[in-house]
């Protein structure tokens, strides 16, 4: 959630209804608006035996690769090619494909599916291996995402994030929904439904829980939602505002922003709700905490210098070391997020009357805007650090967008028909 003047929070009240596991009618749709400058040409043949199945694995793989902006899908024709087939790799190279994928989906006696595939390097004329996955009617999409992840890693040397999940808040009419979806916005499920706003969802490192802020008791309270069970529990209901939850890397602790004593300050609380501890001791407003991946530091937003900027302090708090200012490009910077490798800081900077997503190299201090939008908020790194998800406006509507973290390509816009979408958080790698 973007900070407003003096970092005050929006005046929100909510009354919430748990709807765990419900299918979402309004799903996020991905519109590809730009691709990377360097694309890997690949041909993915139709998988054998998938006609008539609930999900077409081949289509999911192709769509994932195209959406990444890193691949060009070469026409592989309509003839299915199983992984057991003899493949003329030279012929596929002649068609412009530097890699070729063959596979099959076979239904087993127990009703499950066995999904097999092989990835070939047509340039070196060799196999790059493959996987044998077990799936059900409801997990065929996941199998497709895992295949795309395998291809991405084998050909680009970086782990793919197609099998990760997103969380975000959709508003349709007067109803708000906290939704959990696949990385492509499909297979969306409702975690929480409300007649009023829901804010600040944050994934646990395990990907099984989401912390968020609810206003159902006429004040902001931090909850944790257990996704496998659909249950939730209260974590912080202190006097005043309870906001901006952020998980520690070991999942044991949440950093939160509380106005317990007046000005909003940074605290930590155990994930079970106990062990409250104050970390900042300033007379200013300190908010939006975020842990470094190694757990040593907490980055946060503070106006202690007169205007909002990003600072860093030891995870034990200012008693263990003074907070140090991190951002110096721009006079108004908020919403810190650290890349999974700890090398980059993403944040929102007020620029020319708008708000833009910036990325800063934490070693050199160099910072650059990476978007062509100007109402940006709520950045979130993909688990591999190669992309950022954020909220913005497009065509007068609140939408999400995904952009390479190096700014090498324009954003992909993610929107929902008939509604607005905000408060994104990109989930971790799934085990």
UniProtKB/Swiss-Prot annotation:
GO CC aspect terms: periplasmic space
Family membership: Belongs to the TolB family.
UniProt GO BP: cell division; protein import
PANTHER family per UniProt: PROTEIN TOLB, PROTEIN TOLB HOMOLOG
Annotated keywords: Cell cycle, Cell division, Periplasm, Signal
Region (Disordered): 411-431
Protein name (database record): Tol-Pal system protein TolB
Quaternary context: The Tol-Pal system is composed of five core proteins: the inner membrane proteins TolA, TolQ and TolR, the periplasmic protein TolB and the outer membrane protein Pal. They form a network linking the inner and outer membranes and the peptidoglycan layer.
InterPro entries in alphabetical order: 6-blade_b-propeller_TolB-like, PD40, Tol-Pal_TolB, TolB_N
One Pfam family per UniProt: TolB_N
UniProt superkingdom: Bacteria
Compartments in which it is found: Periplasm
């Amino acid at each position: 959630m973007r900070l407003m003047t003096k970092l005050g929070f929006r005046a929100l009240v909510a009354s919430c209804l748990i709807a765990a596991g419900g299918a979402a009618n309004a799903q996020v749709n991905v519109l590809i608006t730009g691709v990377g400058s360097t694309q890997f040409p690949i041909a993915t043949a139709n998988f054998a035996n998938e006609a008539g199945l609930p999900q077409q694995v081949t289509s999911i793989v192709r769509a994932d690769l195209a959406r990444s902006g890193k691949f060009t899908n070469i026409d592989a024709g309509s003839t299915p090619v199983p992984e057991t087939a003899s493949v003329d790799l030279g012929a596929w190279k002649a068609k412009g494909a530097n890699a070729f994928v063959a596979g099959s989906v076979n239904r087993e006696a127990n009703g499950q599916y066995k999904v097999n595939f092989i990835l070939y390097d047509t340039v070196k004329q060799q196999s790059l291996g493959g996987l044998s996955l077990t799936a059900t009617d409801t997990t065929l999409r996941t199998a497709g995402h895992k295949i795309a992840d395998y291809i991405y890693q084998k050909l680009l040397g970086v782990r793919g994030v197609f099998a990760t999940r997103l969380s975000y808040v959709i508003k349709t009419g007067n109803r708000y929904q906290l939704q959990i979806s696949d990385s492509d916005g499909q297979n969306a499920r409702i975690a929480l439904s409300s007649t009023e706003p829901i804010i600040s969802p944050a994934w646990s490192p395990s990907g099984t829980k989401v912390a968020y802020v609810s206003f159902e008791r006429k004040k902001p309270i931090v909850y944790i939602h257990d996704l496998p069970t659909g249950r939730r529990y209260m974590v912080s209901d202190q006097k005043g505002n309870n906001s901006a939850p952020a998980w520690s890397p070991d999942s044991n602790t949440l950093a939160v922003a509380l106005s317990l004593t007046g000005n909003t300050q940074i605290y930590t609380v155990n994930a079970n709700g106990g062990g409250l501890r104050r970390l900042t001791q300033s007379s200013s407003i300190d908010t939006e905490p975020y842990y470094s991946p190694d757990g040593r530091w907490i980055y946060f937003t503070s106006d202690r210098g007169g205007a909002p900027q990003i600072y860093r302090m030891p995870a034990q708090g200012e008693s263990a070391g003074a907070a140090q200012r991190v951002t110096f490009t721009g006079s108004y910077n908020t919403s810190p997020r650290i890349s999974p490798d700890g090398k980059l800081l993403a944040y929102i900077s007020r620029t020319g009357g708008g708000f833009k997503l910036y990325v800063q190299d934490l070693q050199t201090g160099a910072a650059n805007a990476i978007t062509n939008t100007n109402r940006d908020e709520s950045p979130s790194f993909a688990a591999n650090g190669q992309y950022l998800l954020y909220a913005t406006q497009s065509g007068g509507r609140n939408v999400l967008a995904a952009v390479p973290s190096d700014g090498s390509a324009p954003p992909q816009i993610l929107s929902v028909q008939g509604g607005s979408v905000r408060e994104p958080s990109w989930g971790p790698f799934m085990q």
